[in-house]
Every structure is written in C-alpha cells, then in structure tokens.
C-alpha cells in the first residue's frame, strides 16, 4: 500500500505551506491524482486521515481530482491521452511512449483559517 507514503509526503507539504502562509488550521485539501498513479481512492482517503492526524490538517476535507495520463510519442512527436502504462500511440500505433503527466500525486491547493 504505497498510498500511506504518498499521504505522508502530502501531509508534509501541507504542513509546510500552512506554516509559510500563516494558516493555523487547514479545512480543505485538493489532491490531483494521475490516472496511472495506481492509487485506490478509498485507501487514499483512509491513509490521508492517518497521515494528517495531530497536524494542522487533521479533520480537513479531502477533495480528489483524477487527471488523465498524457504521453509523448517518440515516433510521431505528438502528445496523446493514454489509459495504461503499456499502450500504443493512438495517432501512429507506436509503443515508444514517454509518460509526461498523470502518473503522480500532487497537492493542488488547500484552504484554511
């Protein structure tokens, strides 16, 4: 379950940002999760609650935005949306793809008081 380590890293980022911006209590957090991040949403919610325990983000509302994965094709030099790690370019059929977006998790924004 790599969700816990991802959430621990996100909690560190949230704590740092809250400290930098003078936020005493985080009320909402938006995470951007790539479609190829291999993250289970229910596990992410569970682990996020654990990671934020005893921090400024404890009890905050977690919002998850799933973003599509993008890959760059080395053969036709075009960007394409992909649904799996091992795929083919929808433009030319090549398997020479480099994932450029959508395989990670990011703290998109947070709100607090």
UniProtKB/Swiss-Prot annotation:
Q: Name one GO biological process term.
A: protein maturation
Q: What PROSITE patterns does the database record attribute to this sequence? A: HYPA
UniProt cross-references to InterPro entries, sorted A to Z:
HybF (IPR039002), Hydgase_Ni_incorp_HypA/HybF_CS (IPR020538), HypA/HybF (IPR000688)
Recorded GO terms, molecular function?
A: nickel cation binding; zinc ion binding
Q: What family does the database annotate?
A: Belongs to the HypA/HybF family. HybF subfamily.
- Database matches in PANTHER family: HYDROGENASE MATURATION FACTOR HYBF, HYDROGENASE MATURATION FACTOR HYPA
> What is the protein's name according to its record?
Hydrogenase maturation factor HybF
Q: Which organism is it from?
A: Morganella morganii (Proteus morganii)
